[in-house]
A protein has these predicted regions:
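Conserved NTP-donor binding/palm subdomain of two-metal-ion nucleotidyltransferases/polymerases, i.e.
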Residues: 1-119, 125-402
Length: 402
């Protein structure tokens, strides 16, 4: 298996962009290149890599339109960052220390930090700090995405502000506890709040725990619908900047526990060999000769978090069941994808938690939504979802996830 010319050009552009360099591409279709970059939330970096090359003169109208897109995206990110920083100060003033994770912490590793786009800002709070942090957000004009009486049953709550740009997700647990396979991922971070690090005015996890979280977060999305190239960039840059602060043997042991070691090794290989992020991996990581190309192709095809199309999104229930079966040894048929267990449905349809007898109605609502979505998207069908799910299950077997 190998990358096609369009995929090669895209990876070259990303590599150049995250290093602040120019990308000289061969026979590139720049319209397709920018479309892929949009899907991957990497347009600012890709555009920055090609805007000073001879391609500009040959595609002036296209480049002018993309330039405006980039300006809008970066400006929006800058405003969102500033608003989040002001909000975070409110937590600190009250003696609260929510942990900042993902995009906000990773963006500072890039040459142009606001080119690293984030749809939201994520904070991880202790049980004791959850309601105080919620109250501060509400007092500062934010609105929660769930009613007050459901707050304590949620793993995460999203907050938005009218006429504001910030979108904050507050996590009581870093992984969704309604999906059985993620419960043991949460256990790795039980003591995270006892080992905080201060970084540029934010509290975050120590470098090792952050590395583990980035890998497991990527793993969570991969076994669902897929992951994007941006996550490879984040993990690679984190590895490079914090090589000496990461306990690599322990990291391998932790990843092995959840069958994510080969998957992580493939990501490190992509970062090293395709994205030009240089860092030395000690044993046992350095011993892996796993092919990373299948993972790379799947990630380019799927877009950020595998959200490029409904076929891929709908295939996720099948792949998730396959992963669960591999983890607990319990065989699950296609019916478990159509009729998920009550614990899963409670998280998606809150009325099931209040009235368990409405579970059949929630199943019906879920099926109706699927029928509506497939009707609106002619390229999507149950057969195509099953076909893609089988293909992705084989991919997961390549990395010993299943």
């Amino acid at each position: 298996m190998s990358l096609n010319s369009a995929e090669i050009n895209f990876i070259k552009a990303v590599k150049a962009g995250i290093h602040g360099e120019n990308a000289m591409l061969k026979d590139a279709d720049y319209s397709a290149l920018f479309e892929t970059a949009m899907q991957q939330k990497l347009l600012p970096f890709v555009f920055e890599a090609v805007r000073k090359t001879s391609a500009l003169q040959q595609n002036q109208a296209l480049f002018a339109a993309e330039k405006q897109q980039v300006i809008n995206q970066v400006l929006s990110q800058t405003l969102r960052s500033a608003e989040f920083e002001e909000t975070y100060k409110k937590f600190l003033e009250e003696g609260l220390r929510p942990i900042v994770v993902k995009g906000r912490i990773c963006s500072r590793l890039y040459p142009l930090r606001d080119h690293r786009l984030s749809a939201d800002d994520d904070i991880f709070v202790s049980e004791n700090d959850f309601l105080p942090c919620h109250n501060i957000l509400m007092q500062n004009g934010f609105t929660a995405d769930c009613p007050e009486n459901e707050l304590l049953s949620k793993d995460e709550v999203s907050y938005t502000k009218e006429n504001g740009t910030a979108y904050i997700e507050m996590h009581r647990r870093l992984f969704d506890s309604s999906k059985d396979m993620h419960d043991d991922l949460n256990s790795f971070f039980d003591d995270a709040h006892a080992h905080l690090t201060s970084t540029e005015g934010f509290f975050t996890m120590n470098p090792h725990d952050n590395m583990l979280y980035l890998i497991l977060h990527a793993y969570k999305h991969f076994v669902c619908s897929g992951i994007g190239i941006r996550q490879f960039c984040d993990i690679g840059l984190w590895s490079k900047n914090y090589t000496a602060d990461i306990d690599w043997p322990l990291l391998y042991e932790q990843c092995q526990k959840v069958r994510a070691a080969k998957f992580a090794a493939a990501i490190f290989k992509i970062a090293n060999e395709y994205l030009g992020i240089e860092f030395d991996l000690p044993q046992p990581w350095s011993e892996s000769d796993i092919s990373c190309v299948p993972l790379l192709k799947d990630s380019i095809c799927g877009g950020i978090y595998g959200s490029n199309d409904y076929t891929r999104l709908h295939s996720s229930t099948i792949t998730l069941n396959a992963v669960r079966s591999g983890r607990d040894g319990k065989r699950r048929g296609i019916l478990s994808s159509v009729f998920p267990p009550k614990r899963y449905m409670e998280n998606k349809y809150s009325y099931v938690k209040r009235h368990s007898w409405l579970l059949p109605a929630a199943w019906g609502q879920r099926i109706f939504r699927y029928i509506r979505e497939t009707a609106e998207n002619k390229d999507d069908s149950a057969a195509e979802s099953v076909k893609l799910a089988k293909k992705r299950i084989e991919l997961m077997k390549t990395y010993d996830i299943i």
